[in-house]
């Protein structure tokens, strides 16, 4: 029987630990067995129980205090993750082997781990050898994504992780519950974006012809291949959380021995149908 894993990624402060705590609580309400593993050696606290904690193997503070290494916070974290990649047997022993395992891996926030360093790719390959079906869950803070150029930056980060790890990936805008009604209405266009229209709306801000061409080329790549779209995540909205879980389960074929159904939100114009309920509170604003 296969095992299942969500690799919860994203920049620092994007809400990875909150996502794990919320998803764990939601799955428990559905009587689904889900466990969490902390892979952030710099974590100070989190709101969920774990079956494995990388800090039992190595901690950033210990590395930084080692006079022979002389690492700062970022270098110390990279060292910890490289040490972890050489000690996957610790993770295997911590996980054990139970059929139908469903694990959430709460990962560090250093973006270079998902763009050009091999550590997370090695983790994915190791999990696959242990018969895990792995889905990347890339989080971005919705409060950061309300401007077109910031949105493009977030899309490129998500796309880099997708290309690097070569696994199914679901991209999520977190902290939707913290947005004002006006901001919710504004951000709807970024969930399933028309990149060309967005660029036309912001063409005045592109003063440099060289960078204007580059930005338009990037937007064209994203739009033409439909590579990146986002789902909203509001920790107070059980239906919205379930929609996210459906998409992830579908991508890794969770429970394939049962009748697997495609998530109801997968259709041609999701922005007009998927999120009506979520944004109904903005209709009168």
From Swiss-Prot:
The record marks 74 as: Stabilizes the phosphate intermediate. GTP binds at residues 13-18, 174-177. Residues 262-285 are annotated as: Disordered. Coiled coil: none annotated. A motif (Gly-Pro-Asn (GPN)-loop) lies at residues 72-74. One of its GO terms (molecular function) is GTP binding. Belongs to the GPN-loop GTPase family. Heterodimer with gpn1. Binds to RNA polymerase II (RNAPII). This is GPN-loop GTPase 3.
């Amino acid at each position: 029987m296969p095992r299942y894993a969500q690799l919860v990624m994203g920049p620092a402060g994007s809400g990875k630990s909150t996502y794990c705590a919320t998803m764990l609580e939601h799955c428990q309400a559905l009587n689904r067995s889900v466990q969490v593993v902390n892979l952030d050696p710099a974590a100070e606290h989190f709101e969920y129980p774990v079956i494995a904690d990388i800090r039992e193997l190595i901690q950033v503070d210990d590395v930084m205090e080692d006079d022979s290494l002389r690492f700062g916070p970022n270098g110390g974290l990279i060292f910890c993750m490289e040490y972890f990649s050489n000690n996957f047997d610790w993770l295997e022993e911590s996980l054990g082997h139970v059929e139908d395992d469903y694990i959430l891996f709460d990962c560090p926030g250093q973006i270079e781990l998902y763009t050009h360093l091999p550590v997370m790719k090695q983790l994915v390959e190791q999990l696959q050898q242990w018969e895990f079906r792995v889905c990347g869950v890339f989080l971005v803070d919705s409060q950061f994504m309300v401007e077109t150029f910031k949105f493009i930056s977030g899309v490129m980060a998500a796309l880099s992780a997708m290309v690097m790890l070569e696994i199914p990936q679901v991209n999520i805008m977190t902290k939707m519950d913290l947005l004002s009604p006006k901001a919710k209405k504004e951000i709807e266009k970024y969930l399933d974006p028309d990149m060309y229209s967005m660029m036309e709306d912001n063409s005045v801000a592109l003063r440099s012809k060289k960078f204007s061409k580059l930005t338009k080329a990037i937007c064209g790549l994203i739009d033409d291949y439909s590579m990146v779209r986002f789902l909203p995540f509001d920790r107070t909205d059980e239906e919205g959380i379930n929609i996210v879980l459906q998409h992830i389960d579908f991508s890794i074929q969770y429970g394939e021995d049962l009748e697997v159904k495609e998530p109801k939100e997968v259709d041609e114009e999701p922005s007009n149908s998927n999120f009506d309920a979520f944004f109904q509170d903005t209709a009168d604003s």
